[in-house]
Each structure stands twice: as structure tokens, then as C-alpha cells.
Amino acid sequence: MFAMMETARLESLHFAVDPLTGLQAMIAIHNSRLGPALGGCRYLPYADSQSAIEDVLRLAKGMSYKAALAGLQQGGGKAVIIRPAHVDNRGALFEAFGRFIETLNGHYITAMDSGTSSVDMDCIAQHTQHVTSTTAEGDPSPHTALGVFTGIRATALARLGSDNLEGLRVAIQGLGNVGYALAEQLHAAGAELLVSDLDHGRVQLAVEQLGARPVASEALLATPCDILAPCGLGGVLNHTTVGQLRCSAVAGAANNQ
């Protein structure tokens, strides 16, 4: 583990366990030279602790670059909570996580991410002020999607010669909060949507509301399109999958695509 931290140039890695609520959490602080480490909290059923550690290290590093590129006086961090098979009280679990954050004395600020909601952030906020994207602040997903949408327009201009998205085929992998908001914005701009998600209900919603064409998750990367937009958990591009791509560009919301 220490070798992994050194390779990632991580400042610190913190662990918390709360048997009463089932909390098993990790907070990684990659770099705090510019200020407190900012990064969302993921709540996912990781296969094991090693998978969770690898994810939090990778994501924390990415947040350092994001914060720096955005000109923020903040560093990069990330948190993951290993989602248990059964939770008696989700609110109590996130309150326990809030107490964990508070022990870091402001060195880490959390926010929504995969598997978490603004209601979860409200529970965290009962025990620490170092949290954002609460219900009072609103869902940040549409704003994130707008940034990706703007990036897609710029990408289309650079690669295809026009930022007019009318008729452009965009394949979206992942229809979570950000992915679906992006799909709505692309649909409004006249793009043709090809979508996939492990949640078939989300896919059906996109078909009914946005006229999207469903594609099996395992087939999406090899589906002909103009732009591929990975909006899931990231890490989808590797030596194997890159050779399958049939798109002109990749521009999505996923971390570490």
C-alpha cells in the first residue's frame, strides 16, 4: 500500500470503521499545497478493500489537477465508502462519515459523487462544515454536464469542423445524474443519442424522453459514432478497448477515462 501511495505521490490516506452503522471509509489527500483537498465521496459496493484503495488514489490525484486547472485555491482529495450488502440506517452511516471528516480538521472537503446524493451530504453536514452540494446548495450535476457539453462543442469544432451538434451522433456510456443531464442538453441541441447503462430503467427513460437508441453496455465502445462520452465510473479506455473505438473523439464526464 505504501508503494502505491508513493507512486501516486499521495500526501496521506485515512481510514475509518464504525461497526454500529457499517461504515468502512477511506479519504485520500493527494496534494494540499494550494489549499484544503476537495473531492467527492463515492458510495459503491467495491469487491474488496484493495479495489477501493486503488480507486480513491486514482481519483484523488485527478482532483488535484482539476482544482489547479480551474484556478482554485484548493488541492485534490477523494473519499470512498464501501457500500455494505445491507444498511439499516443510511442516514446514520453518512453521519458517521461526517464525524470522520471532522477529525481531519478541514484538510478535506467532501461533495456528491457516484452513489451519493444531496440528502447524504445533509447528513454529513450535521457533523462537519467541510461539505458541499447539500440540498440547500442544489444538485451540481447539471452544471457538471454543461461543462462537458461545452467541451463536446469545442471538440466537435476542432475534430469535425463545426460546433453545430445537429445530427451529431453521441454515444453516452452511463446515465447517472451527470450522464442523463448531458443527454438532455445534447438532445436539445439536436444530437442523435446512443446510450447504455447497467440500469435499464434509465436507458428506457432516455428512449422515451429523448428519442435515444439503446445499445448494450458491452457493445457501446465499438459502436460507430461521432463522439464517445464516457459518463460512468471511468477507466474504460485501455490498451484493449482503444482499438475497438469507432469514433472521432472521446469527450465525457467520467474521471480518468
Residues covered by each model-derived region:
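ADP-ribose/adenylate-binding Rossmann-like module
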Residues: 108, 112, 227-237, 241-257
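Glycine-rich phosphate/diphosphate-binding loop of Rossmann-like nucleotide-binding domains
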Residues: 139-225
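Glycine-rich, charged/polar anion/phosphate-binding loops
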Residues: 1, 9-15, 25-27, 158, ...
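Conserved active-site and cofactor/substrate-binding residues in soluble primary-metabolism enzymes
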Residues: 47-55, 88-92, 96, 115-119, ...
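N-terminal ligand-binding/catalytic initiation module
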Residues: 1-136
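Short, glycine-/Ser/Thr-/acidic-enriched flexible segments
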Residues: 21, 32-34, 48, 177-178, ...
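Short, surface-exposed connector motifs at secondary-structure boundaries
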Residues: 102-106, 166, 187-192, 223, ...
